[in-house]
């Protein structure tokens, strides 16, 4: 009788165990917690099959129980199973806590490896004379608008509200034509200290008081208390 081909890797051994004991091992998805002492059960039942050795079984079992999907399955209330899928007791709290720490450490190692790889890429880019572009942070508070599904049933859409009737605003009272218009100052020598005057700023004018008449303009004080020198073309009565 010819010898069966030997399994070379721990992953191949795990695939064999999942096929041989489907109620205990699984090749994908969340794994079930294993019975304490299941290694000895494996030795008794599969040693010699596929030319498996104890070392191969121990390595495959270590890889299986340290995988993320196995650690995810070790949670409060979960039951351990034997090779035939029979329950063998609920997990103890200390075992659940130990699995949680192992999972956190594994995730931290992966994040550290990714950060190290990114740092090496940046260093290589800088050495090559390239400037790596920093990641642009996503603006906080802005969320993408929900897309409207094509072909949505018309009854699911909210009816449009009829436009509100526009309110008729009363006409603004026209400015009396007899209202006196401001007169620009043409001769600053006619101004007197203490005289009330207006300073034109754009389209509006501000009240001011004449403080001093100088050669380059008139020093005035605004109603806000601010004093400044203003040229004649910006003054008006």
Swiss-Prot record:
Task: List, in alphabetical order, the GO biological process terms annotated in this UniProt record.
Answer: post-transcriptional regulation of gene expression
Q: Where does it localize?
A: Cytoplasm
**What keywords would UniProt list here?**
Chaperone, Cytoplasm, RNA-binding
Looking at the record, which segments are called Disordered?
Answer: 106-188
**Entry's Gene Ontology molecular function annotations:** RNA strand annealing activity; RNA strand-exchange activity
Q: Which GO terms describe its cellular component?
A: cytosol
The residue ranges flagged as biased composition, category Basic and acidic residues, are 146-158
Q: Which InterPro entries match?
A: ProQ, ProQ/FinO, ProQ/FinO_sf, ProQ_C
Give the family this protein belongs to, as stated in its UniProt record: Belongs to the ProQ family.
Task of the protein: RNA chaperone with significant RNA binding, RNA strand exchange and RNA duplexing activities. May regulate ProP activity through an RNA-based, post-transcriptional mechanism.
Protein name from the UniProt record = RNA chaperone ProQ
The species this protein belongs to is Yersinia pestis
């Amino acid at each position: 009788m010819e010898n069966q081909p030997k399994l070379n890797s721990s992953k191949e051994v795990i695939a064999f165990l999942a096929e041989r004991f489907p109620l205990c091992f699984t090749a994908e998805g969340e794994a079930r917690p294993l019975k304490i002492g299941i290694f000895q059960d494996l030795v008794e039942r599969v040693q010699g099959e596929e030319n498996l050795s104890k070392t191969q079984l121990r390595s495959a079992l270590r890889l299986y129980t340290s995988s993320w999907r196995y650690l995810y399955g070790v949670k409060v209330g979960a039951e351990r199973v034997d090779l035939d899928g029979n329950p063998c007791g609920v997990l103890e709290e200390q075992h659940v806590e130990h699995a949680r720490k192992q999972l956190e450490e594994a995730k931290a190692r992966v994040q550290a490896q990714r950060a190290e790889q990114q740092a090496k890429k940046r260093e290589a880019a800088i050495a090559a004379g390239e400037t790596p572009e920093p990641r642009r942070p996503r603006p906080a508070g802005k969320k993408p608008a929900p897309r409207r599904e094509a072909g949505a049933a018309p009854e699911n859409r909210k009816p449009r509200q009829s436009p509100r009737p526009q309110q008729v605003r009363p006409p603004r009272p026209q400015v009396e034509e007899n209202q006196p218009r401001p007169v620009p100052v043409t001769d600053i020598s006619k101004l007197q200290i203490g005289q009330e005057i207006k300073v034109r700023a754009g389209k509006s004018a501000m009240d001011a008081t004449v403080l001093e008449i100088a050669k380059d303009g008139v020093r005035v004080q605004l109603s806000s208390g601010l004093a400044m020198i203003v040229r004649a073309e910006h003054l008006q009565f």
